[in-house]
Amino acid sequence: MATLGTGMRCLKSCVFVLNIICLLCSLVLIGAGAYVEVKFSQYGDNLHKVWQAAPIAIIVVGVIILIVSFLGCCGAIKENVCMLYMYAFFLVVLLIAELAAAIVAVVYKDRIDSEIDALMTGALDKPTKEITEFMNLIQSSFHCCGAKGPDDYRGNVPASCKEENLTYTEGCVSVFGAFLKRNLVIVACVAFGVCFFQLLSIVIACCLGRQIKEYENV
């Protein structure tokens, strides 16, 4: 096989560098997924079950990107055409999945308030020890009261709705919903950022694979 030219060595270096970036992004995704998982679990099993799939999916995607990025690094270092094309194929599949997930996350954020409202209204209508602890934690953490306001308690406002004898006036649906939306947007932005680097990696990996194949036939 002939020696790769300067341009192809640059492509090889680009593939390697982009994969290192994707690898770091995958670690960020795994960390973000773990953080969201822990955060959601702090607010009780009722909330955790509703959004449990989201952080787990983020962690799984992060692990897959980690493995695929490693494959890309090996393909670039070894100048292996088969590994580079496999790497590009897996990246295309991941790219489509991530774009779909990011779009769904952005669209889904408009439904958060209605789902939180249904969850909290149902919790206040049929209070149990677990649900009461869940509401108390939300109220004390986010300085809110009830689903839509302190009137939800019909005059029997719990201590978690107060601070120095002042009752929180905002409902938890709007306050907690805004918290979830912010985190959802952050996750979507990270996903779009990862997709950008993956798209570059796909193009450069295919170019490198084609050029290596041409050099092998010289």
Swiss-Prot record:
Residues 37-55, 109-183 are extracellular. Keywords: Glycoprotein, Membrane, Transmembrane, Transmembrane helix. The chain crosses the membrane at residues 13-36, 56-71, 83-108, 184-205. Glycans are attached at N165. It comes from the Eukaryota. It is a multi-pass membrane protein. Gene3D superfamilies: Tetraspanin (1.10.1450.10). One of its GO terms (cellular component) is plasma membrane. Belongs to the tetraspanin (TM4SF) family. PANTHER family: TETRASPANIN. This is 23 kDa integral membrane protein. It comes from Schistosoma mansoni (Blood fluke).
